Structure formats: C-alpha cells, structure tokens
C-alpha cells in the first residue's frame, strides 16, 4: 500500500481526528510544518495496533508526546501525520524499527533519553 499523503491533524487551537478510517495496525510518522503542508519535518515514528485509536489519543492530549506536541503548536507550527497500514502490529514494528535505524527522529531520541534518565 505505502505511505499516505501527509494529513493536517492539529493547529494551535484545533485537532482534526475525524479523517482516519483505518482500525488496524500501522506504522506512522508525526511532523511539523506550515499551514499548507510544505517543508514538513518528520519528528517521530511509531507503531500501533489501531491507527484510528492512536490518532484519537493524540487529539485528546493523553499521549506520551503531549508536552512536545503542545510546545510546537504554541510556537505556531502545524502538526501532520502520515501512516503506512499493514496487516499485523509486528509488521508495523518492523517498519518502525527500520526507519529508526535509517533516520534520526528527534522526538524519539528525546523520549528515549528521558526514559533512560528516569530508570
């Protein structure tokens, strides 16, 4: 199937979580950019067993990324999402792990450093 086109999911004052229609596993990326979606910088890669539930979780500010996302939105950035639907959560994790080996995602690095310090 491949990666979806980037989708705007949040501005400073509004979350858009009603577009997601996939209830299955996916690998996904979160990034920031301007209002028209140009020059998106991808900050985070993750995997989930249910794409729709994950997006709703982000929209309700109940995720482990809440502080990072809120800070970027307050600075005037727009939050974008793109996903890669797969058949199993294991396949989503495999894609995530490949991307983590290949690219440096600053939010993943920041969260991993924080969790190591807390242990």
Listing of model-derived features with the role each one plays in the protein:
Residues 102-119:
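Intrinsically disordered, low-complexity regulatory tails
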Residues 10, 67-69, 105, 109-110:
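Intrinsic disorder/low-complexity signature
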Residues 1-54, 77, 83-98, 117-119:
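GIY-YIG nuclease catalytic motif and its immediate N-terminal context
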Residues 52-75:
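A broadly used, surface-exposed interaction patch
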